[in-house]
From Swiss-Prot:
Domain of life: Bacteria
Pathway assigned in UniProt: Pyrimidine metabolism; UMP biosynthesis via de novo pathway; (S)-dihydroorotate from bicarbonate: step 2/3
Catalytic activity annotation: carbamoyl phosphate + L-aspartate = N-carbamoyl-L-aspartate + phosphate + H(+)
Name of the coding gene: pyrB
GO biological process, one term: 'de novo' UMP biosynthetic process
Organism for this UniProt entry: Prochlorococcus marinus (strain MIT 9303)
Stated name of the protein: Aspartate carbamoyltransferase catalytic subunit
EC number: 2.1.3.2
Binding site for carbamoyl phosphate: 59-60, 109, 142, 145, 294-295
Annotated Gene Ontology cellular component terms: cytosol
Keyword Acyltransferase set for record: no
Keywords noted in UniProt: Pyrimidine biosynthesis, Transferase
MF-aspect GO terms: amino acid binding; aspartate carbamoyltransferase activity
């Protein structure tokens, strides 16, 4: 883990294969912790993690707070409804309040793109040592979700060694509202960086053709590692094109709250054309796992019986894996700050 250099975690565009390996390897160690007895590690004892969620969340917020507590960190939660935002306080001033209270990490979720990055830059300019972890910003990025999905798939393909190599050459199909999904963007970066080929499936209004260019272009000021084999991205319009040969399928929620009026999709028609069922998954030609980042619209993205079929659905596994992945991220950020690895002696 000595190669880890990300003080802030804002997206996955700049992650190297070594970075993905560091997160997945550490998360797997945390996942292997016994579920009974002493469930806390002293790694972040004396540290303060503040969760600043300016947008509603159930899974992500709870997962980060559980992750921080399992590493013995103190946790402070921010709730917009009872905050000074209603009195005109800015997001930056709110963040600075928690920094002044001694927060070591701010986990920030916001409906507007780039807010976590703007906060990180502002804190850096003022010489603060507080790190910022993006808990989801607008349509841009949701790095911890992308990483937990990556780990869930790697563990499915190789439970003994769930590292990026387990994704090499796999065909992963993502169905649904890609346009409005920060999860899709993070998954595209993670999966292709680890050598998986990704097929995006949906109507043109929800799956633009230019998403191929989105992944193939390197981040500003960077270049792709010429040695690293990156997966390809393909856009198709029907499940009949997408599913044959798939190794895993992920479906995305229709995010009506982010859609302009002319993009609103008839739900019955969407389910007819793109809703996943047991019968449709037979097009894959073999048993494949099903993922969904949640929350799920039953009867829209997929049939309720499919969601409840634990021989296929990895949705609850994704939720479980969110905790060790977020423990790994918080641990690695703390290691950068202290220039040494906090103790992991309790898990060997």
């Amino acid at each position: 883990m000595s190669g880890w250099s990300h003080r802030h975690i804002l997206d996955l565009a700049s992650f190297s294969l070594e970075d993905y390996s560091s997160v997945l390897e550490l998360a797997h160690r945390f996942r292997s912790m016994p579920v009974t007895g002493a469930r806390k590690l002293p790694a972040l004892q004396g540290r303060l993690v503040a969760t600043l969620f300016f947008e509603p969340s159930t899974r992500t917020r709870s997962s980060f707070e559980l992750a921080a507590r399992r590493l013995s960190a103190d946790v402070q939660s921010f709730t917009p409804a009872s905050s000074s935002l209603s009195k005109g306080e800015t997001v930056l001033d709110t963040a600075r309040t928690y920094v002044a209270m001694g927060a070591d990490v701010l986990v920030v979720r916001h409906s507007s793109t780039s807010v976590p990055e703007q906060l990180a830059c502002a804190l850096d300019r003022s010489g603060e040592r507080t790190a910022v972890l993006n808990g989801g910003d607008g349509l841009h990025s949701h790095p911890s979700q992308g990483l937990l999905d990556l780990y869930t798939l790697a563990h499915y393909f190789d439970s003994q060694n769930p590292l990026p190599e387990a994704l090499q050459g796999k065909r992963i199909v993502i169905v649904g509202d890609v346009l409005h999904s920060r999860v899709a963007r993070s998954n595209l970066w993670a999966l292709t960086a680890c050598g998986a080929d990704v097929v995006l499936c949906g109507p043109p209004s929800l799956v633009p053709q230019d998403f191929v260019a989105f992944v193939e272009a390197p981040p500003p000021g960077q270049s792709h590692d010429p040695v690293q084999h990156r997966g390809c991205v393909e856009v198709v319009r029907t499940l009949e094109e997408a599913l044959p040969g798939a190794d895993a399928v992920m479906t995305l929620r229709l995010q009506k709250e982010r859609m302009h009026q002319h993009l609103l999709t008839d739900l019955n028609r969407f389910h007819r054309d793109y809703g996943l069922t047991h019968e449709r998954l037979k097009l894959c030609g073999k048993p494949v796992p099903l993922l969904h980042p949640g929350p799920v619209n039953r009867g829209v993205e997929l049939g309720g019986s499919l969601l409840d079929d634990h021989s296929i659905s990895l949705v609850e596994e994704q939720v479980r894996n969110g905790i060790p992945i977020r423990m790994a991220l918080l641990y690695l950020m703390a290691a950068v700050e202290s220039s040494s690895d906090p103790s992991l002696a309790a898990i060997g």
